[in-house]
């Protein structure tokens, strides 16, 4: 990736883009569900199926979890029809209907599986597909930067960058929830992008975290500019921030000289202090631009 592409891939807008792309796969119920069972053909109106689709999509569960629920929800609608016809179906009948080829095929058409690598490869190689989901998020010139210069011959042959790996992780979590650890320790946090931080945050969504870093020393173009921003993307906006502004390694005279850059590099950060004072150790020497 170029620095510009990596920066855009680390932008939090990518989370919205990927969410849209995944959930766009959910179809619309235009045809009724028809389930043959014995001598009967049980019919569920399309509008009832659509209500189930809307309810599952609005539950806030992962795409894959909702997809797994759909056959049982459809089978339940079939059972309601059986009961209205005077039958007394039980849970075993519902399970059998949910496993039937008619329900499985119908559910797969409305809620197809999504594979993260295929999804991302499509977005990065198809300008029309990218624009469909990114049109109001990324400017046309930004979309052009995101697109691969030379799309792979097949999606299986795609070569993923480090920035792509984080997007694949985001996609995987949209499909199935990432398990949370009890505690995560993160060092050098100042160099991470918002999407990096989201990936770490998923690993401690129900746990805790210790995050270390110096915002003023961020070395990447995609780095965040404040602890407030970093912790928000990490999913811990209310976390306690302990400022460690005393050090021994660098003499006070050097710190004082370097701190002149703070207002430009990290506005709002306080000046660090050194417990070691060595007057006269810092010598500033003017030199030519070519030296």
Question: What residues fall within each predicted segment?
Answer:
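Hydrophobic alpha-helical scaffolding
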Residues: 4-12, 60, 64, 93, ...
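Generic recognition of well-ordered alpha-helical segments
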Residues: 17, 106, 257-260
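Conserved helicase motor core of SF1/SF2 NTP-dependent helicases
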Residues: 1-6, 169-183, 190-291
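Conserved helicase NTPase catalytic core signature
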Residues: 28-183, 192-197
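Phosphate/oxyanion-binding active-site loops and adjacent basic polyanion-contact surfaces
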Residues: 14, 70, 163, 167, ...
């Amino acid at each position: 990736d170029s620095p510009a592409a990596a920066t855009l891939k680390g932008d939090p807008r990518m989370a919205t883009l990927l969410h849209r792309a995944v959930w766009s796969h959910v179809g619309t119920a235009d045809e009724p569900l028809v389930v043959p069972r014995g001598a009967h053909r049980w019919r569920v109106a399309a509008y009832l199926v659509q209500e189930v689709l809307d309810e599952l999509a609005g539950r806030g569960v992962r795409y894959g979890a909702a997809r797994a629920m759909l056959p049982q929800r459809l089978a339940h609608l079939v059972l309601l029809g059986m009961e209205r016809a005077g039958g007394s179906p039980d849970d075993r009948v519902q399970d059998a209907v949910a496993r039937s080829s008619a329900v499985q095929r119908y559910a797969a058409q409305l809620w197809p599986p999504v594979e993260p690598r295929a999804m991302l490869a499509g977005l990065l190689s198809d300008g029309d597909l990218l624009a469909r989901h990114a049109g109001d998020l990324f400017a046309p010139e930004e979309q052009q930067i995101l697109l691969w210069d030379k799309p792979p011959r097949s999606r299986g042959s795609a070569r993923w960058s480090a920035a792509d790996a984080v997007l694949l992780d985001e996609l995987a979590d949209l499909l199935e929830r990432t398990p949370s650890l009890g505690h995560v320790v993160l060092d050098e946090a100042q160099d991470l992008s918002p999407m990096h931080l989201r990936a770490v945050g998923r690993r401690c969504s129900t746990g805790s975290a210790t995050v270390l870093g110096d915002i003023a020393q961020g070395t990447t173009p995609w780095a965040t500019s404040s602890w407030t921003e970093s912790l928000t993307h990490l999913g811990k906006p209310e976390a306690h921030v302990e400022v460690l502004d005393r050090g021994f390694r660098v003499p006070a005279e050097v710190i004082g000289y370097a701190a002149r850059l703070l207002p430009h590099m990290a506005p709002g950060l306080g000046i660090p202090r050194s417990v070691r004072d060595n007057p006269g150790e810092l010598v500033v020497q003017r030199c030519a631009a070519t030296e």
